[in-house]
Amino acid sequence: DGWFENVRPLTPREKELLAASLPKDEEAVKKVLGVRHWIKDEDFLTSTYRLASQPTVNIQGLVSGYTGPGGKTVLPGRAEAKLDFRLVPDMTKTEAVEKLKAHLAKRGFGDIEVIVSGGYSPTESPENSVVIQAGAAALKKAGIEYSLFPRRAGSWPGVVFTGPPLKLAAGH
């Protein structure tokens, strides 16, 4: 339904940075995340690329029907789902909401009310920006190993700095 049409692919440099930042102990990462394998049985690096470059729709919660003690043989007349979107560069919150509505309508659920309670567009900062280079230099001077993540999974409100009207770089 067009969910991926404005997703900008990772550049060769972004892939290089992601590969360099990959934790060495894949099994420890799986343990922390509570998984036995990566989606579609992909290798660790491919899954890392997917995590950094593809938007997601996450179900935060579902409520419907009778949830009290005992049983009831009634059909629920109402259901709620709380979602969050994790957007990537070149996508917008408005576009994501419209695509969700179109997806629902195409499947016969055009009467579902979609309430948007917040959110923001994705953000990123160039690797060569002053703030990123200053942070890297400070870590290096302190003898601290660091990695540059060209994209993180999900959005964060840094767009208030990196988006119009300021258009400044911001670390995350």
Give the positions of each predicted feature:
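Acidic-enriched catalytic cores of C-N bond-cleaving enzymes acting on peptides and small amides
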Residues: 1-64, 90-110
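Short glycine/threonine-rich loop-to-helix capping motif typified by GTGT followed
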Residues: 14-21, 123-132, 158-168
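Short acidic (Asp/Glu) and glycine-rich catalytic loops that position anionic groups and cofactors
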Residues: 38, 77-82, 110-117
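Zn-dependent metallopeptidase/amidohydrolase metal-coordination segment
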Residues: 53-55, 60-62, 71-79, 141, ...
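C-terminal catalytic subdomain
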Residues: 69-97, 122
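Hydrophobic, well-ordered secondary-structure elements that form the walls
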Residues: 83, 135, 161
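A short beta-alpha structural unit
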Residues: 85-88, 113-128, 151-154
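Generic non-transmembrane alpha-helical segments
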Residues: 99-108, 130, 134-142, 164
